[in-house]
């Protein structure tokens, strides 16, 4: 029994010493997101940091409470000293928030589009349109086609950093809302998920935040349930 306890104690000491040997690294966002620290992570070897994913809410990054439902993901792509750089690899929106936006007597129209930006990044974009009243099938088809065309065109005409800002901060959603509401009454537009499929040129430049909000709302009051 004494031997077993001694072995157990020795194992605990080894585990404790291993943890103490780890070094903490600060994870920074790309310069297009401010180059801010979004978290810390420990590692024995800095090489093991490459590829790690760090998550942060858009609210925490921008200090805008209305962005609480959006989560952003950054992958570590380099280490210098105790600092780790990262690249944006996608975002999503909480299920609870999306469910709360769906109402009866409205139609939900989804679009999933793989696009390539001006600087060669391939991105999968998932967008959602909610109509103000129930739409017929031909209206849904027309809106979906128009959504896909707008997303493809904006990606083709902009660099990756600018396109990401348009997705997250409202430029892309506002463009879809403005064009598609001419076809049918709309209530809401969400760019609810994205995923970077291929990386292009490593171009980083500060991007001005669009004035429009991420969520485009119709000026009229909601349809009574």
From Swiss-Prot:
Pfam families: Ribosomal_S3Ae. One of its GO terms (molecular function) is structural constituent of ribosome. Keywords: Ribonucleoprotein, Ribosomal protein. GO terms for cellular component: ribonucleoprotein complex; ribosome. One of its GO terms (biological process) is translation. HAMAP family: Ribosomal_eS1 (MF_00359). This is Small ribosomal subunit protein eS1. It comes from Methanococcus maripaludis (strain C5 / ATCC BAA-1333).
């Amino acid at each position: 029994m004494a031997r077993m306890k001694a072995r157990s104690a020795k194992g605990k000491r080894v585990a404790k010493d291993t943890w103490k040997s780890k070094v903490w690294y600060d994870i920074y966002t790309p310069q297009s997101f401010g180059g801010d620290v979004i978290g810390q992570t420990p590692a024995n070897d800095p090489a093991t940091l490459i590829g790690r994913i760090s998550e942060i809410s858009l609210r925490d990054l921008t200090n805008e409470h209305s962005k609480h439902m959006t989560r952003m993901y950054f992958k570590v792509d380099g280490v210098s000293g105790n600092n780790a750089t990262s690249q944006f690899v996608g975002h999503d929106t909480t299920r609870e928030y999306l469910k709360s936006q769906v109402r009866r007597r409205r139609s939900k129209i989804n679009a999933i589009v793989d696009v390539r930006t001006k600087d060669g990044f391939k991105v999968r974009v998932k967008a959602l349109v909610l109509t103000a009243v129930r739409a017929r099938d031909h209206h849904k088809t027309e809106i979906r086609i128009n959504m896909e065309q707008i997303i493809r065109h904006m990606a083709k005409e902009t660099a990756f950093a600018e396109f990401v800002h348009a997705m997250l901060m409202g430029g892309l959603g506002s463009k879809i809302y403005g064009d598609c509401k001419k076809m049918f009454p709309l209530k809401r537009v969400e760019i609810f998920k994205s995923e970077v499929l291929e990386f292009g040129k490593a171009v980083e430049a500060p991007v001005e935040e669009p004035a429009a909000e991420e969520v485009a709302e119709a000026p009229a009051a909601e349809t009574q349930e």
